[in-house]
Structures are given as C-alpha cells and as structure tokens.
Amino acid sequence: MKYADRYGNRWEETGLQDRFLEKLYKSVPGRAVVKVLVHPWVSRMGGWILSQKASCWLIPLFLKGHPMDESGWVKQRFTSYNDFFMRKLKPGQRPVEEDTARIISPCDAKLTVCPITEYGIMKIKHTPYTVKELLKSEKLARAYEGGYGFVYRLTVDDYHRYIYTETGKKSGNYKIPGIFHTVNPIANDLEPIYKENTREFCLIRTTDAGTVLQMEVGALMVGKIEKDQEEAFVHRGEEKGRFAFGGSTIVVLYQRGQVQPDQDLLDNSRDGYETKVTQGEAVGDKVGKCRK
C-alpha cells in the first residue's frame, strides 16, 4: 500500500492483511472462497458474532497489534468487540475545522481525491468508474459531471464514527443493495467494488457548496452501517453514523465549480498515494469563499 501524510512524507507498507488478501483475490482457490465471503449473510453472521459478549477476548489481541491512546475514549470497558470497535471519543479529540470556507473530512481515513470528467468518469486507484454506476441513477450522476469525488477508505485502526461534512437540508437515505467485497485496494484492482458493494447515500443541499452527496459503502465483515434515516436539517461536524467491524468507505461528491481540493491531496492521489486524514480536518476550499 502507498501512503502519504499532510507533511509531505510518502511511504509504502504491506501488512499481514494485505498479503492475505492478495493471495485470496489472486489465486483460483482464493477466488472461490471470495464468492462465498462476499454474500451479505456472511457479513451479517460475522457482525452478530462480534456483537456478543464472548467476543470481548478479541479486544486485547487487537490492541496488541494496534496500540492506541485509551485516555481519549469515553469508556474503557466494552460489552462486545463491536462495542469497542464503535467506541466514542471524548469531546475535543477530533476538532472540526472552524473556517467554513474550507471543506472537511467526515472521518479518519486514507483519502483519494478523484476529478470527475465531463463524461462522469472517476478513477479510484487506477480503476475507472462512472458516477452513474456508483449511484445507479443517470439523472443524478449528471449533476456531478466535472466535479470531484473524495474517497475516504477506513481501515480497522481508524475511528469508525463519521460526521456530516456540511450544514444544510438532508434528504432521506437511498440504499443500493449489493454484496460485500473488502474495500482494500488489492480487491479494487480486480473487482469493481464501488459499483458492486452495498451502499447508501443522502444529499445535503447547502447554501455555499451546492448539493453535496455523502455515501457510505459497506465492506466485507461490516455487519451494519448505523445511521439516521430521516430528512432533516443537519450541521457540519454533527455525528452522522458509525460502522461496525471491518474496513469501510465514505464517498463525498461535489458538483462542478463548488470546491477546490488541497493541492497535496491532488498530487498524492495522482501518484497513487492515499493520504491519511482525520475527522474534521480541512481538505479543500469552497470556490469563491474567502478563508478566515
């Protein structure tokens, strides 16, 4: 995997999970196993198991491999592995950028910024997708031609609660049923995961950034995506939902002429590097708005 930070550093790392997925997706026996694993019932079963009290023994094993500062958590005792995975942080642990002329990240993640062509095509890690395939709506897809797609990939070590990126009137949620591939880039090289995986999105009609589309993409072993369902007026930085165990992705689409991504994010994405960002961090400017 190729990663970058906001300080100009770039590096590559391959973890145990990456090596396992590479063998799984790139071998004949592995592909046969994948065909079973991606079915929704497998993720539902996994989610149920990890929501049981008996799963708590997995927590210290996870922390051994992924050391964390526990002082920022609201609680230190958990009723299940999923309860731990969806843990809440204390106020102030993820400050939201105060300058509303800047756009923000909805979550802790590895970010790829994808320009959307005038034909509605965006490349995610060198794999071309059309916005129409992503949304299953040609009419809605046309509204984002020439804009930008921000693809936030969460891994198991990320904070799995996420927020609204903008203030505005939110639509109801639209669900697109599908299967549950892992969102690891290794799978994306071989499978069109962002047009096959289960996903849900809403529209946020804002006064200064057009109509923003915010989508949650389910993934292998994500038992559920917990979120609100109703139409409402929402506020930037307000909690929108949380993912149960597993890697997941949030996709945010902006219309043409509404935002300008930060240059380091564009450069990293062009060169195939995902940039590590945190929830509430500024990732670009609203066009025509002056920074404070």
Named regions from a protein language model:
Residues 1-292:
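Contiguous, well-folded functional domains in the mature portion of proteins
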